[in-house]
Amino acid sequence: MKEQKKVFIKTLGCQMNEYDSARMHEVLNEHFDTVKTDDYKDADIILINTCSIREKAQEKVFHELGRWKGLKKTNEDLIIGVGGCVASQEGENIIKRAPFVDLVFGPQTIHRLPEMIKQKQKTQQSQVDISFPEVEKFDYLPEPKAEGAKAYVSIMEGCDKYCSYCVVPYTRGPEVNRPFEDVLAECAILAEQGVKEITLLGQNVNHYLGPMENGQTADLALLIHFIAEIDGIERIRFTTSHPVEFSQNLIDAYATVPELANHLHLPVQHGSDRILINMKRNHTILEFKQKIRKLRAIRPDITISSDFIVGFPGETEEDFQKLLDLVKEINFDQSFSFIYSKRPGTPAADLPDDTPMEVKKDRLKRLQDLLNSNAQIISRQMVGTNQRILVDGTSKKDDNILSGRTENNRVVNFKGDKSLIGQFAMVKITESLPNSLRGELI
């Protein structure tokens, strides 16, 4: 009989990391019969799945590790591990800075966690494996287990874009595409377990080129068409996309696949062609707007969110105004926006940057104020409309109130029977609040 171990996993960063954290627990459970715990003080294994997109996210890792250091005094068998992109970037340096850490593993070596733990216990030496093995982690995925009506499905890993500011190609490695039939099989299993909404994940998900058993290659549009045919799957999302690979095939899918959510997250990063060139984004603002126009010709009411970087080296007030103009023209919905964070080893780190931080903070506030205004207007326009809600559970504030999300990712709270959890429900929107909507069951 396997010894049961309590596992605490803290996840920082993107949805891919959330997916990876779920895989960590499943891999460990196959070998050690693990149970999750929300209290790190009660755990036998503590893992932090890290993000290195921004400097603050990196420092947060060592802050968390500092909180856990003292636990070793009362539990000498405790295993502490660091995974994710900071692990890939820092490697052995994590052990040097925090010698009490037992494991350092990258996104591609999650499947080796059980063996790393055994080696640590056998040798009493910290284990580091941040390689990009020839055999991808997709070959070692455990049987998928649904947790609710929504699920993430990873379809590709890594990125070949090498945008000048980004560490992802260095931490996640080159693009690796998961076989087409394997993705469909996982989606079918999840559907049998009650999953109704699938979010397809990849660092550059719309560049998916999955090998097929017949020797051909499937793009994201073809994959979406096939997933939509699986009984039980009623809503499909994908993230994160790059404008260059937002193809006509994918745009056309919005006309023929009603299961595709009426919302798109498409990071543009900036509104100035000059800045986009320095970012090595390989597209112009005109090309971006042309693709959005084609999409809205098919789905006029689709909402579009994005990612924005403010204060990139060399950004002028004129550049920033072009960004604001783009946000107004496209009418971007709720989006992510950050001040540029210099990442060591990236080309942008060597660019001269003489814009004062006070100016960058002011620009970020102006951008966020505009984005928030857009989002509030979109929310208010939804009042009086009927929305199809996937009911996730109950409200965080009131266990007697149901909660779910619209196609455009709005949280809606409404009264209803708990038997609706995990199902779709039609709800009339009655009120717009700053961070959510209220509604009535139809």
Curated annotation (Swiss-Prot):
Cofactor(s) recorded for this entry are:
[4Fe-4S] cluster
Query: What's the domain of life for this entry?
Result: Bacteria
* Pfam short name (any one): TRAM
Q: Where in the cell is it found?
A: Cytoplasm
Which coarse location class describes where this protein primarily resides? cytoplasm
Domain TRAM, residue spans: 380-442
Q: Name one GO molecular function term.
A: N6-isopentenyladenosine methylthiotransferase activity
Residues involved in [4Fe-4S] cluster 1 binding: C14, C51, C85
Instruction: Provide the MTTase N-terminal domain boundaries.
Output: 5-122
Look up the record and report any one GO term of the cellular component aspect.
cytosol
Radical SAM core domain sequence ranges? 145-378
Question: Where [4Fe-4S] cluster 2 is bound, by residue?
Answer: C159, C163, C166
- Which chemical reaction does it catalyze? N(6)-dimethylallyladenosine(37) in tRNA + (sulfur carrier)-SH + AH2 + 2 S-adenosyl-L-methionine = 2-methylsulfanyl-N(6)-dimethylallyladenosine(37) in tRNA + (sulfur carrier)-H + 5'-deoxyadenosine + L-methionine + A + S-adenosyl-L-homocysteine + 2 H(+)
Identify the InterPro entries for this entry: Elp3/MiaA/NifB-like_rSAM, Methylthiotransferase, Methylthiotransferase_CS, Methylthiotransferase_N, Methylthiotransferase_N_sf, MiaB_methiolase, rSAM, rSAM_horseshoe
Q: How is the cofactor bound?
A: Binds 2 [4Fe-4S] clusters. One cluster is coordinated with 3 cysteines and an exchangeable S-adenosyl-L-methionine.
Q: Which E.C. number(s) belong to this protein?
A: 2.8.4.3
Please name the Gene3D superfamilies in this protein's record.
Answer: Methylthiotransferase, N-terminal domain, tm_1862 like domain
Q: Which UniProt keywords apply?
A: 4Fe-4S, Cytoplasm, Iron, Iron-sulfur, Metal-binding, S-adenosyl-L-methionine, Transferase, tRNA processing
Q: Could you confirm whether the keyword Endoplasmic reticulum appears in this record?
A: no
Q: Record's family?
A: Belongs to the methylthiotransferase family. MiaB subfamily.
Q: What does this protein do?
A: Catalyzes the methylthiolation of N6-(dimethylallyl)adenosine (i(6)A), leading to the formation of 2-methylthio-N6-(dimethylallyl)adenosine (ms(2)i(6)A) at position 37 in tRNAs that read codons beginning with uridine.
Description of how the protein assembles with itself and partners: Monomer.
Q: Which HAMAP family match?
A: tRNA_metthiotr_MiaB (MF_01864)
Protein name (Swiss-Prot/TrEMBL): tRNA-2-methylthio-N(6)-dimethylallyladenosine synthase
Q: Which organism is it from?
A: Francisella tularensis subsp. tularensis (strain SCHU S4 / Schu 4)
